[in-house]
Amino acid sequence: MAREFGRTERVADYLRQELARLLQMEVRDPRIGMVSVNEVEVSRDLAHAKVFVTFMERDSEKDASEALAVLNHAAGFLRTELSRDARMRTVPKLRFVYDAGVVRGRKISDLIERAVSED
């Protein structure tokens, strides 16, 4: 009988939760603002993790790219903080990616609401 969740999925879920906590509690850079960790994809060898984030107060691509640069610069600090937990022997190298799907979804939802209200 196969396991319901593989190791990479468990590690990805753990990283998503811990990174959300660390970004809220430990990172004090005002250039980031409020950030939401949407998803984490971990490579099969657990060496790399792609972290999909959105920013609550930044809708333009320029603002998001600046905040992404700050997050990618802080990736080493976050990786060190994650390594202090004894649950993982090695912590994947983190790479932050802007998740534009949430913003697109919000725009589509606004368009639908506007179309419905015009009828």
Regions found by a protein language model. Give the residues of each.
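Charge-rich, low-complexity N-terminal segments
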Residues: 1-48, 54-119
